[in-house]
Amino acid sequence: MSFKFNAEVRSKQGKGASRRLRHNGQIPAIVYGGSEAPVSIVLNHDELNNAQIHDSFYSDTIILVIEGKEISVKVQAMQRHPFKPKLVHIDFKRV
């Protein structure tokens, strides 16, 4: 199964901005690795939450579309809420 998600570059950083994103149904994330600089992005929570149910989400290559550019990544780390079925933050590593 292949996964493809649309992402936006984050303009505001910090705890308050991240909380506002989560409250609006989005997840802060970061893409790093390779020769390019790390990029902070925002993803739709519901799309990722539905995709992370599949085992292949953690092992297969994921395509992120950031500003019209497709980037191949894999999940490096994922933070979940302690008792709610919600994602808090995701780290992606370029492939």
Curated annotation (Swiss-Prot):
Signal peptide: none annotated. CDD domains: Ribosomal_L25_TL5_CTC. Pfam families: Ribosomal_L25p. Keywords: Ribonucleoprotein, Ribosomal protein, RNA-binding, rRNA-binding. SUPFAM superfamilies: Ribosomal protein L25-like. GO terms for molecular function: 5S rRNA binding; structural constituent of ribosome. Residues 1-20 are annotated as: Disordered. GO terms for cellular component: cytosolic large ribosomal subunit. InterPro entries: Rbsml_bL25/Gln-tRNA_synth_N, Ribosomal_bL25/Gln-tRNA_synth, Ribosomal_bL25_short, Ribosomal_L25_dom, Ribosomal_uL5_bac-type. GO terms for biological process: translation. The keyword Cell division does not apply. Belongs to the bacterial ribosomal protein bL25 family. This is one of the proteins that binds to the 5S RNA in the ribosome where it forms part of the central protuberance. Part of the 50S ribosomal subunit; part of the 5S rRNA/L5/L18/L25 subcomplex. Contacts the 5S rRNA. Binds to the 5S rRNA independently of L5 and L18. HAMAP family: Ribosomal_bL25. This is Large ribosomal subunit protein bL25. The lineage of its organism: Bacteria, Pseudomonadati, Pseudomonadota, Gammaproteobacteria, Pasteurellales.
